[in-house]
Amino acid sequence: PISDAEKFRIEYWILEEAKLARRPKPKALAARVAFVTGAASGIGRAIAERLAAEGACVIVSDRDAEAAQDVAQGIGSTDVAVAVPCDVTSEGQIQDAIAQAVLAFGGVDLVINDAGLSVAKSLLDTSVDDWDLQHQVMARGSFLVSRESTRVMIEQALGGDIIYIASKNAVVASAKNVAYAAAKADQAHQVRVLAAELGEFGIRVNGIHPDGVVQGSGIFANEWGDDRAAHYGVERDKLGEYYAGRTLLKLEVLPAHVADAVFALVGGELTRTTGSYIPVDSGVAPAFPR
């Protein structure tokens, strides 16, 4: 006769083992905690949504608290996404936001510096206030976010990723754009400097250089969009097509394409890459490395 134990093994345990073997693999970013600035619209929103879809818990950070909350709720419950208002020009607000991220999810190990703005003016029309604001938001703001999140990552001793959303303008000179281009160039060099410093802690620092991301953009929704349309002599709602037309691939760059590049860097396939950047511009020859 068959023992009760053998009956159990035949009828139950083998079946359960088969079920376990058929379970889907964990998502690529499971157990990662991402802090995304400028996440209420455009590129930042697309990145936050993509990282969450790949398994990460996400802090949706933006100075527009209501919009950030809408994005977080759209992603999912507070077990997955939490909105944290933050103006990156404020050192104190950044410190508080990182602390809230740690409180919400137990740590931070994936940081996206996306917050930005632009005021396009000629050199003679660019005021000190114009210059200071763009550097405070992008150069200084990303420095502060990187510094405060690095404190956490070093203490965690688990490594991590910092990604800067810079711009094609970081490497291509264009007229009537001095403050924005200089701030983006600052961000691009922060990538290299921080990569050199943080490698010993297992923290990788990389950048993305997009170009012409009009759809859903908070930057293009303001005076920047009007100015660029006037500068290029096109209708505002045709800006995306215009930018696509001057690229090698003749394809418009959307926020989701930038999010794809971020995931490529942090999804586990490029673990030996740091201090570099990925252009997401459909091919802009003047931006080629040289």
Question: Locations of the language-model features?
Answer:
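Short, small/polar-rich loop/turn modules that mediate ligand/substrate recognition or access, typified
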Residues: 199, 204, 273-275
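Alpha-helical segment proximal to the catalytic Tyr-Lys
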Residues: 151, 196-197, 271
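Short C-terminal tail/terminal secondary-structure segment
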Residues: 270, 274-290
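Active-site helix of classical SDR
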Residues: 146, 183
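Active-site loop immediately N-terminal to the catalytic Tyr-X3-Lys motif
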Residues: 124, 172-178, 200, 250
